[in-house]
């Protein structure tokens, strides 16, 4: 609605400015009003960085009518905190007013000169620091008033939505662990990170929620694991392992087994996973997603989803669309995240029926790591020295690890 009003006003203004003689427009007085053209973008999104910096945005006043004003029109701009509640009620949000020390309305008055349609530019400075909260939207309503002309109420307020993100190359990270050995697979399970080493050992890195930190690696009983399993991946309260080279004894290549890791560190092998599809060496990656297991074909040309139906039976087999030639693929909420050889972090919405949504690039520079995976809401990267680095991830931001 706001955009339609502004388009109508601009069309009239354009017609008048191109005409050599006056044009009479019926009810022209109804279009003669002042407004903020930036208010057509609702909200007006201002993306800033978590830096000690000032980032400037511009607004102005505009006169819409069949003819330019015959006299100067004076307007004032002001911050109206009461409109934050109005915005939240209308949009179902709970945003807060941008703190007063985080903005500066450089000038609060402007003039639309006689014979003109636009005022001078008003600068709005958004002031951030390294302590500015990232990924937390704030609202800054700036409204216009004038005693010289009618104000078009629907476009009289621009709602700045200010959201800060980390600047490229300045994203904080924390080293949480050093892997004892090269990994075959690595995953989060039961509030810990587990490494399945290439030499067969299983290491556990426990997470302490009270201290928000990980403990040292502990080797757990790996009876029945060793090199007899190609991959391990968690799903719900269990860990799935794929047999390799006829191991465990008497099984075919690719047979799935179900494990549970007890508090004491003992692993139990349950019955073989029933309803096994014809797994073979053509799969090179196994990924858990909600109640399903995803298997990527060797090289990433395709990927299949097998629904477990919440039990130990593989059900529906769905071929996912697209190519999956990525260095890392992992589930994150209702999405699959991927990292390609260029380091781009990309989000693919995915349904439980296997429908893949359109990709969105949400990061770059992630080729710093040879593997990336999720732990709760955070992302973990494994560097070339097998160090684990943790990012307090938020899907609302863009995560550029390099400048």
Can you say where each PLM-predicted feature lies in the sequence?
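C-terminal motif of bacterial Sec signal peptides marking the signal peptidase cleavage site
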Residues: 14-17
